[in-house]
Structure formats: structure tokens, C-alpha cells
Amino acid sequence: MEYSDVPKFIRDVSIKQHEWMRESIKLIASENITSLAVREACATDFMHRYAEGLPGKRLYQGCKYIDEVETLCIELSKELFKAEHANVQPTSGVVANLAVFFAETKPGDKLMALSVPDGGHISHWKVSAAGIRGLKVINHPFDPEEMNIDADAMVKKILEEKPKLILFGGSLFPFPHPVADAYEAAQEVGAKIAYDGAHVLGLIAGKQFQDPLREGAEYLMGSTHKTFFGPQGGVILTTKENADKIDSHVFPGVVSNHHLHHKAGLAIALAEMLEFGEAYAKQVIKNAKALAQALYERGFNVLCEHKDFTESHQVIIDIESSPDIEFSASELAKMYEEANIILNKNLLPWDDVNNSDNPSGIRLGTQECTRLGMKEKEMEEIAEFMKRIAIDKEKPEKVREDVKEFAKEYSTIHYSFDEGDGFKYLRFY
């Protein structure tokens, strides 16, 4: 390939990506789609610029307008989450977690968090952010039948182990975690409580999930691009008392420049969430429950039927124990992709953490299809597409044609100030 051909190659591949997504059912629980206004903001001159430090206290010149943008982000974040302090500079949820780990612990301290098979994010584990800080990770007691932390056993373990930091939240997250149950024990042993809300930040913002800052958490960290429908990035909400400490551990601790164009997009997404977040989050959870019920009725072993399956955006399926399914979770994930149904295989609590290539489960999320206008009726259709492949054993390429026709009807962004085409390719030249 000639160097001069690279721009055209990238444009062609990008257009293919847009069209593929237009014709696909998108069920990855850690993704979402932004509004056109957010995209426009992310494509501004801010992408070329650099800023270190806080608004009004920059180490670089030329920041007067990004100061306005970031100040607005901070104020809207505080309003949305009813927080005393917000830092919007983390470039991801993992970076937000790392900043809190550095602010509140020292090497050798104990961190209490979910194990990865029980739903903990990899950044909670010794191989990632927790290990970078040199923390000793102890795991929350977990009840796989309830798909949640065992609150009584957790309190006992806090009193016995005396962790420095107690972390809630995770990647497999169908139900609120027992934050309030941990508060008294945490106070007794001198532990701080932090909540990784990366997956459920949009549901918290929409007032449809738990409110960790009111339940005893001093920190709420999160990604701004999962159930929260902004550009990729991270945020930390905390108290006034923690403000200087966390700000200094974000910069210069773990962030230098903080992707200024994404802050412009984030400001718009925050405004959208303040305006539309409650209705959006309600529908996300309604859709998750409807999808879970429809799959369960079609022979999938959807976990926690006795609890109405889920209280979040996530639907968890144990493929290995679904009697009518002869494929593995890994095989099915690939087959669904061939049919333009995009989802992921996932470890479940009874899986070996080292067997992530061949886990028992599949994880689904309803946040993106909700933003594209789908409701409960469409969840029935999605479940039927999934059944045709997993149980009826139809060829993925045959199902794909029906999926494409279905998905193309849902390409308009909802819950935004500009209900435009979510998959239109925007050209600059």
C-alpha cells in the first residue's frame, strides 16, 4: 500500500464499520452510542490541544476555552450525581480506579473486591491496577445463587481482615451491591469505601440503581461510555474533604493531558443525561428484564429467574447448563457475530479465572439498543434470533439476513437533543 492510500483505506474501513453496526444488534454490555452533538464536540480543535492541571491553574497557555468546557463538566457532574466534588480528567474507568487506589492506599495494604469470576473488573485484580499499586487483594464472599455479595459474610470478613479500602462494583453486575451493609464495619476498622460504577453509571445518573454516595461510599468512579452514553473517559465523584487529595493523584499522579475533546463531548452527554437520563435508565432496565424473560422462555438458562433476572442493563446466561444448547459459550459468541448479533462470552462464578477463553457464560447489555429506540417488543424479536442459532441450529448466515433488516429500523439516536442517524459517516474532506 502506498502511504498516500492510507487515508482512503481508513475511510473505507470506517465506512464498513458504520454499515456493519447499522445492520447489527449490539448487545455488548460495556458499549454505547453517542449523540451527533457529542460527536461534533469530539471532532473540534480541542483534540489538538494540551492542558495540565485544573481549570484556572494550568501549566500551559492557550487553555481559556477548555477551562470553560471543563468547568462546565465539573459542575454538571456534581449536579447529576449530587456530589460535593468531581474530577473529570481520568482517561478511562481504570485510570479513575488507579487514582483512588493511589490516593487511599499504600503498597501492602488490603483491598477487598470481587474476584474476576464473581464479576470483578480486571483492574480490581493483582494483574492490573490493584497490583500496580502493590495491594493485597482479598475477595468479597459471593453467593452465586443470588449473583451478589453475601452481605453477612462480607461484614464478618471486613472485621477479620481489616482492609484499607473496600471496593464495590464490577463487570458482571446484575444487582446493586450491599454498600450500606458494609458502612458500620468499615468505620470500625478504619476502611474507606469506593464504588466502581463503570457499568452502571448511567443507571445511577438516571436514578434507577443504588446511590452509592448516599449509602456510605466516599468515592464513585466510573466510565463515561457504557450505560453512561458519553465519549470514552472516566470520572471520579467524592467529598470536599477528599478533593485536593484525589485531584493531586489524578494529576500529576496518573494523568497528564486528559483528552480535551472528550471533555467537550462529555459536557453535552452530561446535559443529555440530566434531561433524559431517568426515562432512558428506566427503559434500559425494562428491556433487560424483557430480554431475560424472553430468552428464559425459549430455553436459555438465564440466571436469577427467582429475582426477575436483573436490576441493571445486564442479562447473564449460563450456556453450559442450558440443556437445549449443544454449543459452548465461545462457539456461540462467534456464531452470533456471524449473524450480526454482537455480544461477549463471560466468566461465571464457578469458572476457573485462567479459562477466560472458554467460559460458561454469555453477558448481554440493553443500553445501546435502548438508546436506538428499542423497547420490550423488540427484546422478544432479539430473543427469537438468538434461539434460532443456539437451539434451532439455523445457519448464522441465514439468520443474519433477517437481523440486518431488523437492525436497520433502529439507527436513530434517542434520549438526546438531536435525534439523528447514529451510523451516518461524517466526512471532513
From Swiss-Prot:
Pathway: Amino-acid biosynthesis; glycine biosynthesis; glycine from L-serine: step 1/1. GO terms for biological process: glycine biosynthetic process from serine; tetrahydrofolate interconversion; tetrahydrofolate metabolic process. Its EC number is 2.1.2.-, 4.1.2.49. It is found in: Cytoplasm. GO terms for cellular component: cytoplasm. InterPro entries: PyrdxlP-dep_Trfase, PyrdxlP-dep_Trfase_major, PyrdxlP-dep_Trfase_small, Ser_HO-MeTrfase, Ser_HO-MeTrfase-like, Ser_HO-MeTrfase_PLP_BS, SHMT-like_dom. The modification N6-(pyridoxal phosphate)lysine is found at residue 226. Keywords: Amino-acid biosynthesis, Cytoplasm, Lyase, One-carbon metabolism, Pyridoxal phosphate, Transferase. Its cofactor is pyridoxal 5'-phosphate. One of its GO terms (molecular function) is pyridoxal phosphate binding. Pfam families: SHMT. It catalyses: 5,10-methylenetetrahydromethanopterin + glycine + H2O = 5,6,7,8-tetrahydromethanopterin + L-serine; L-allo-threonine = acetaldehyde + glycine. The record marks 225 as: Plays an important role in substrate specificity. Belongs to the SHMT family. HAMAP family: SHMT. Catalyzes the reversible interconversion of serine and glycine with tetrahydromethanopterin (H4MPT) serving as the one-carbon carrier. The use of tetrahydrofolate (THF or H4PteGlu) as the pteridine substrate is 450-fold less efficient than that of H4MPT. Also exhibits a pteridine-independent aldolase activity toward beta-hydroxyamino acids, producing glycine and aldehydes, via a retro-aldol mechanism. Thus, is able to catalyze the cleavage of L-allo-threonine and L-threo-beta-phenylserine. This is Serine hydroxymethyltransferase. The gene is glyA.
